[in-house]
Design a protein with these regions (language model features):
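RNA substrate-binding interface of SAM-dependent RNA methyltransferases
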Residues: 1-13, 59-147
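A short acidic, often aromatic-flanked loop/helix-cap motif at beta-alpha or helix-coil junctions
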Residues: 24-29, 46-48, 126-129, 149, ...
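Short, well-ordered secondary-structure micro-motifs
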Residues: 31, 79, 105-106, 131-133, ...
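Short, hinge-like loop/turn segments at secondary-structure boundaries
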Residues: 35-38, 109-114, 157-161
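Structured adenosyl-cofactor binding patch, chiefly the S-adenosyl-L-methionine
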Residues: 109-112, 176-226
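Active-site/ligand-binding-proximal alpha/beta "capping" segment
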Residues: 141-190, 195
Length: 266
């Protein structure tokens, strides 16, 4: 209860309008999704265009790592990719506007706060975007079971784009043609494939292991991460909400003082 009350105090101190409602009303406004007695209505997630992401990455002082998703339609997979990518130090995500999960409440919930920190570029055409990234000096590496080189052997130096397809369809034929190289993750068990978010996490970890992780030993801290600004102006709040108290006496709906068009629950 103390953590729940602390959350309410922080919300009120930040100018959030707090409204106590019935459980039935909370279920209605959250669309019946699983929650812990509290929901927050926020503005939609901020995104930036691809040119801004490329320009921002050019000023980082280290080789940028971007992820691109091809046909990932499950918001839980998207949220898991964002969470792993942000935690392991990726610099941004390229997300198609079509044939892709969006930056929804479900994705934000699985991302567990990471969506607020990882820049996302929404693009109309993924393959044209990959060509634009190659023109900017990036190598495009696609994850595919039929890849001609393993993850352990592939060159992961320099600016990179890692492209992941869906677990059932993989990369589209056209996307494969726009990759500089196809890489596979060797598997030993009977299970023929990995979840898309898990495969992506393994690849991002391998890039990190060969780069910023290589000089870290014992309890040495990780180097700070610098990423492109998500907007040239002040960044609005992204979809998020949380409470660690599973059963407060009265459900609460919080509404921020910004234009709100998405509803989140946790």
């Amino acid at each position: 209860a103390s953590k729940f009350l602390q959350l309410l105090r922080e919300a009120k101190a930040s100018g959030v309008l707090v409204e106590e409602v019935t459980w039935a009303r909370l279920a209605q406004v959250t669309g019946g999704s699983v929650h812990q007695g509290i929901a927050l209505q926020t503005a939609a997630a901020d995104t930036l265009d691809l040119s801004a992401l490329i320009d921002g990455c050019s000023e980082l002082g280290e080789p940028p790592l971007l992820l691109a998703l091809d046909g990932i339609t499950d918001p839980h997979n998207l949220g898991a990719v964002v969470r792993s990518a942000e935690a392991m130090g990726a610099h941004g995500l390229v997300l198609p506007q079509r044939r892709s999960a969006g930056l929804t409440g479900s994705a934000a919930k699985v991302a567990a706060g990471a969506m607020e920190h990882l820049p996302v570029a929404r693009v109309v055409n993924l393959n044209r975007s990959l060509e634009k990234l190659k023109d900017a000096g990036y190598r495009v590496i696609g994850l595919a079971a039929e890849g001609d080189v393993t993850l352990m052997d592939v060159d992961l130096e320099g600016p990179l784009v890692l492209v992941t397809g869906s677990e059932d369809q993989g990369l589209s034929v056209l996307t494969r043609r726009h990759c500089d190289q196809l890489v596979r993750i060797p598997l030993r068990g009977i299970t023929p494939s990995l979840n898309a978010s898990v495969a992506t996490a393994l690849c991002v970890y391998e890039v990190a292991r060969r780069n910023w992780m290589k000089d870290i030993h014992g309890q040495a801290p990780s180097p700070p991460i610098v990423r492109p600004q998500m907007k040239t102006q002040e960044v609005s709040s992204l979809p998020s909400a949380a409470s660690e108290n599973p059963q407060p006496e009265q459900p609460v709906v919080g509404q921020s003082d910004i234009d709100s068009n998405s509803l989140e629950s946790d």
